Curated annotation (Swiss-Prot):
Gene transcribed to yield this protein: Clrn3
Primary localization class, coarse: membrane
InterPro entries: Clarin
Lineage: Eukaryota, Metazoa, Chordata, Craniata, Vertebrata
UniProt topology in membrane: Multi-pass membrane protein
Protein name (record): Clarin-3
Coiled coil: none
Family: Belongs to the clarin family.
């Protein structure tokens, strides 16, 4: 059976891993990843299109300086994108977050298993915990970078705007990233905290082993028998 110290520390790691699972699920479910303001003109009006969307769903509205305003629209991100580079990169972002979710789930399983067992010298021990947390953080970071690249350089918001309002001409676009996007940093933070907890446990375990292996010369001697 594991010691009380090990149980408590790995349960702490389990809670932080479980926290990252919950955060990733929130990231996938919410649609406040980005809000884009697209300044446009068409034959009879001009103004701003405001698009807010996440990985799967979004909303759009017009703020006109003059002309007849369209009704607000709800849309499916993947549903209105054709087979384009924007859609391909968006799918990669979703895939990376799903992989990060799977890695965080495995980290939760490994930390909980270590809190009730002693698979220390195998991959099921701390090495497995480090691996899954490292992969989870890496996948999330790549998803962040690709999403920003798709929005800024690959003009994802402009593509969505053209599909929603085909008769408009886009002039300029600005982006504001929402809480769903910034939650990805919390996932990386929780992955780091989980790894740090296990590092502290390993250091404490190493110190205990060193104390148990004190040289014989420090032990009391009553005498030497010949």
């Amino acid at each position: 059976m594991p010691t009380t110290q090990k149980t408590l520390m790995f349960l702490s790691g389990f809670l932080t891993s479980l926290g990252s699972v919950v955060v990733i699920c929130s990231i996938l479910a919410t649609q406040a990843w980005i809000t884009s303001r697209i300044f446009f003109t068409d034959a009879i009006s001009n103004g701003t299109i405001v698009i807010t969307y996440g990985l799967f769903r979004g909303t759009s509205a017009q703020e006109l300086n003059e002309g007849l305003q369209d009704l607000d629209k709800n849309f499916e991100v993947l549903g209105i994108l054709d087979n384009s580079s924007q859609k391909s990169l968006h799918l990669v972002v979703i895939l990376l977050l799903i992989l990060s979710l799977a890695a965080s789930v495995l980290s939760s399983v490994f930390t909980f298993y270590n809190s009730i067992s002693n698979p220390y010298q195998t991959f099921l021990g701390p090495m497995g915990v480090y691996t899954w947390n490292g992969l989870s953080a890496s996948f999330v970071f790549l998803a962040m970078v690709l999403f920003v690249g798709n929005a800024e350089s690959n003009h994802l918001s402009d593509k969505l705007s053209q599909k929603l309002y085909p008769d408009t001409t886009n002039k300029r676009t600005t982006h504001t990233y929402g809480y769903s996007f910034w939650l990805t940093l919390h996932v990386i933070f929780l992955n780091i905290v989980t790894a740090v907890i296990i590092i502290f446990y390993q250091k404490a375990r190493y110190r205990q082993k060193q104390e148990q292996r004190k040289p014989v010369e420090y032990a009391p001697r009553d005498g030497i028998l010949f």
